[in-house]
Amino acid sequence: MRTIAVLTSGGDAPGMNAAIRAVVRTGLEKGLKVMGIQRGYNGLINGEIFEMDTHSVSDIIQRGGTILRTARCEEFRTEQGREKAAKILKAFGIDGLVVIGGDGSFHGAQLLSKLGINTVGLPGTIDNDLAYTDYTIGFDTSINTVLDAINKLRDTSTSHERVSVVEVMGRNCGDIALYTGVAGGAESIIIPEKEYNADKLCKQILQGKLKGKMHNLVLLAEGVGGANELAKYIEEVTGIETRSTILGHIQRGGSPTCMDRILASRMAYKAVELLISGKSSRVVGIKNGEIIDMDIDEALAVERSFDQELYDIATILSK
């Protein structure tokens, strides 16, 4: 192993820069040449590859986003596109590739490994939707961003004695809504993993008002969607003024938290070690506080277990 490269793919997540920094500095310390690939698989196919040194990653650990940029790539979805990518990696003398991203990015790494490229994946996604790992890079920062937002929304909702419906990210995984719902004291949490009934929700809101609640906070994962429609329905049924807020891409930005910086650094260090040891088609994660690695195929096949206990706690504490 003489030369490794790193790319970021899919949606950006706070902590990606910390991971890039750790890959570069660990690789250099181990005597490797480290290359950066811009704009994910799209940049790989277009040959947007450059050599990195310690100065390339100076003063980036505190920055959100990714200095390598990220982009979608339709061409990489084709066999010809992947073969072109593999040839370019070999032409640059790259022996190993670290891919930072979500499940789609991992599928790409998996396919490249079948073309003879040593690959290791790092989980970089705010959704926390990769089942093989307890946490993904970016999740902690995202939930703290959301928590700050709902704290402010609670202030104005209380002042006006209204219902606030807040839509957060999470298509198939409701962890952002669940975690921030518990931490933010939400009265209702609506996530893809659990069915909900709008009429039952309205009844709960009315019961809360009878108990003296001055406001009501409803957290809604985008996988369920329809925050504007739900807010309108709640107001029609209950007669209580209701406002909707869709937080959107603000959840992906911002300086990463201490946890995300440390998690990214530990995972990236492990990724370089795996490549040096000759391992390929692996992903890195964290389980019970320990950094782990496993086969990409096995990782992608792991079924996600829903945290029923946390959901039950949220239900009890919201009453």
Curated annotation (Swiss-Prot):
Catalyzes the phosphorylation of D-fructose 6-phosphate to fructose 1,6-bisphosphate by ATP, the first committing step of glycolysis. One of its GO terms (biological process) is canonical glycolysis. Keywords: Allosteric enzyme, ATP-binding, Cytoplasm, Glycolysis, Kinase, Magnesium, Metal-binding, Nucleotide-binding, Transferase. Pathway: Carbohydrate degradation; glycolysis; D-glyceraldehyde 3-phosphate and glycerone phosphate from D-glucose: step 3/4. It is found in: Cytoplasm. PROSITE patterns: PHOSPHOFRUCTOKINASE (PS00433). Signal peptide: none annotated. Allosterically activated by ADP and other diphosphonucleosides, and allosterically inhibited by phosphoenolpyruvate. Mg(2+) binds at D103. Belongs to the phosphofructokinase type A (PFKA) family. ATP-dependent PFK group I subfamily. Prokaryotic clade 'B1' sub-subfamily. This is ATP-dependent 6-phosphofructokinase. The keyword Ribonucleoprotein does not apply. The active site is at D127 (proton acceptor). Its main location: cytoplasm. It catalyses: beta-D-fructose 6-phosphate + ATP = beta-D-fructose 1,6-bisphosphate + ADP + H(+). Homotetramer. ADP binds at R21, A22, V23, V24, R25, R154, G185, A186, E187, K211, K213, M214, H215. Substrate binds at T125, I126, D127, R162, M169, G170, R171, E222, R243, H249, I250, Q251, R252. One of its GO terms (cellular component) is 6-phosphofructokinase complex. ATP binds at G11, R72, C73, G102, D103, G104, S105. It is an enzyme of class 2 (transferase). Its EC number is 2.7.1.11.
